[in-house]
């Protein structure tokens, strides 16, 4: 059964196509030939008695500071090794208006690059309700705004050829995160494939006293 996102207000459900790699997945994972075009569909449901506007945003996949793949829009800059940005090959409506208590299928148009390649183009389609204004004050009087969105991952490939993993260390620097001193290590995956279950072993030694060491 295909998974989908749902709140009391609205529902987002991908319509899985015939060229889906695994039809049990709750996101798009399609195989399409070079230069080919396809229209994917997502069903939106308005569960309220009020007209509703849903914003759509396309984004390329990225890896966050915790090593997790994210498919929603982010301020993380695209790596220079990114050859195909999903946003350049997928189009969708920017805003969809839903009448009260209705369902509507929307089209997501996909065009595969003309060049042949092995591996995957990865990204996502994010849906968010316009006019969210759920503001609350915490115990310290700080106002917190809660907004909700759903992201459907979209993976596109031309074939099932395996891609050998690769990993490059491009930069090391010091900095701060949440007031803590940290060592920033930039790892680059230049291939069009996921690197899963990766472990990092690091040793930090003092410059003037090599006996001072931290192991991670």
Where in this protein do the model-derived segments appear?
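Long beta-sheet-rich domains in secretory-pathway and surface-associated proteins
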Residues: 4-216
């Amino acid at each position: 059964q295909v998974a989908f996102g749902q709140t009391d207000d609205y529902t987002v459900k991908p319509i899985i196509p015939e060229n889906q790699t695994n039809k049990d997945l709750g996101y798009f994972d399609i195989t399409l030939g070079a230069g080919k075009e396809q229209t994917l569909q997502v069903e939106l449901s308005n569960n309220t008695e009020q007209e509703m506007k849903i914003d759509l945003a396309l984004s390329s996949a990225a890896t966050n500071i915790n090593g997790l793949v994210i498919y929603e829009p982010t301020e993380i800059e695209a790596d220079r090794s990114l050859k195909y940005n999903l946003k350049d090959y997928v189009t969708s409506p920017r805003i969809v208006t839903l009448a009260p208590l209705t369902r509507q299928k929307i089209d997501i148009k996909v065009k595969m690059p003309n060049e042949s390649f092995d591996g995957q183009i990865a990204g996502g389609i994010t849906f968010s309700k316009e006019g969210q204004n759920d503001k609350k004050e915490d115990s310290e009087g700080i106002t917190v705004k809660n907004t909700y969105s759903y992201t459907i991952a979209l993976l596109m490939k031309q074939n099932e050829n395996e891609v050998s993993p690769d990993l490059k260390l491009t930069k090391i620097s010091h900095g701060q995160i949440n007031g803590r001193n940290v060592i920033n290590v930039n790892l680059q995956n230049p291939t069009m494939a996921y690197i899963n279950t990766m472990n990092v072993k690091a040793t930090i030694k003092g410059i003037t006293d090599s006996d001072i060491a931290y192991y991670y």
